[in-house]
Swiss-Prot record:
Key words of the record: Cell inner membrane, Cell membrane, Membrane, Transmembrane, Transmembrane helix, Transport
UniProt xrefs under Pfam families: AI-2E_transport (PF01594)
Ranges per topology, Cytoplasmic: 39, 87-106, 178-213, 270-274, 330-370
Classification via PANTHER family: TRANSMEMBRANE PROTEIN, TRANSPORT PROTEIN YDIK-RELATED
Source lineage: Bacteria, Pseudomonadati, Pseudomonadota, Gammaproteobacteria, Enterobacterales
GO cellular component terms, semicolon-separated: plasma membrane
Protein name per Swiss-Prot or TrEMBL: Putative transport protein YdiK
Primary gene name: ydiK
Signal peptide: none
Transmembrane regions listed in the UniProt entry: 18-38, 40-60, 66-86, 107-127, 157-177, 214-234, 249-269, 275-295, 309-329
Periplasmic side: 1-17, 61-65, 128-156, 235-248, 296-308
Membrane topology: Multi-pass membrane protein
Similarity remark: Belongs to the autoinducer-2 exporter (AI-2E) (TC 2.A.86) family.
Subcellular location: Cell inner membrane
Amino acid sequence: MVNVRQPRDVAQILLSVLFLAIMIVACLWIVQPFILGFAWAGTVVIATWPVLLRLQKIMFGRRSLAVLVMTLLLVMVFIIPIALLVNSIVDGSGPLIKAISSGDMTLPDLAWLNTIPVIGAKLYAGWHNLLDMGGTAIMAKVRPYIGTTTTWFVGQAAHIGRFMVHCALMLLFSALLYWRGEQVAQGIRHFATRLAGVRGDAAVLLAAQAIRAVALGVVVTALVQAVLGGIGLAVSGVPYATLLTVLMILSCLVQLGPLPVLIPAIIWLYWTGDTTWGTVLLVWSGVVGTLDNVIRPMLIRMGADLPLILILSGVIGGLIAFGMIGLFIGPVLLAVSWRLFAAWVEEVPPPTDQPEEILEELGEIEKPNK
């Protein structure tokens, strides 16, 4: 019998693999500037896809109008706040650095301490004793560090330009994905099925659920609390309310809540003697700080029940790895990986035997081998 099987050509196989590797690396190199923007757009589109479908029904089934409205909403949510933040930094950094470097910053008198019952007079006297013992010297020692820190933060504002480019790419890709979302989703599911069969398709669907869960459970809650807290800061007359609102968003994303920003603002209002607005902001901060306990259970019932350590690690790690965009992409990547890992583990039933029985069986197996 003649063997018609062709011998393996090792050189051909190696060259084919090398060619494919070069093509993949070249393609990734070309699309590298767009990867973060596209990933961000994909996250936004998956999370807001139900909203697009509802808008399309309201607008008599016209996808173009729904896409236009969603794009305008994204501009209001992302572009306008960033523009306000940049404007606030530019307007406020100059006078702040000038006051620090020139030595014009002095410690306040804190006359409102006298209004505190029982202990107010002692606090006021103690504060003035501190000033008499070297309050100016304290400011002289602290001032260089304050100036260096402020200059560093202002220097980081240069990264806003790159972030704005990613925002523009996100808007462009989001509009395209809104327009052809069904075709893109079908293509991704087809590719996943080609890779891993039914498991690949299930992995894509689980990933979409995880993305929507992160958007609901983390981002929505953070935005609601931060916006309400920012409104309270603006109404109370706290300076740099826009910048503090952005800091509140970061604080809420890492699951610390808005209070780490609101409490110093309250202290500042009492410090400057504006006790009325300080009390108003104190009450409002209590409402905003506990709002998480109302929103979170509602979102958990909608499928946003994710481990706290997962969200915290995703936000911090994403911020370090990808910058400001990582605040949104980091938790999504970890949540998708977590859901896929959990689904893979659940394919096998959990052990039902007692640990003692397993150890006894293991000991009986090892005895004959001795």
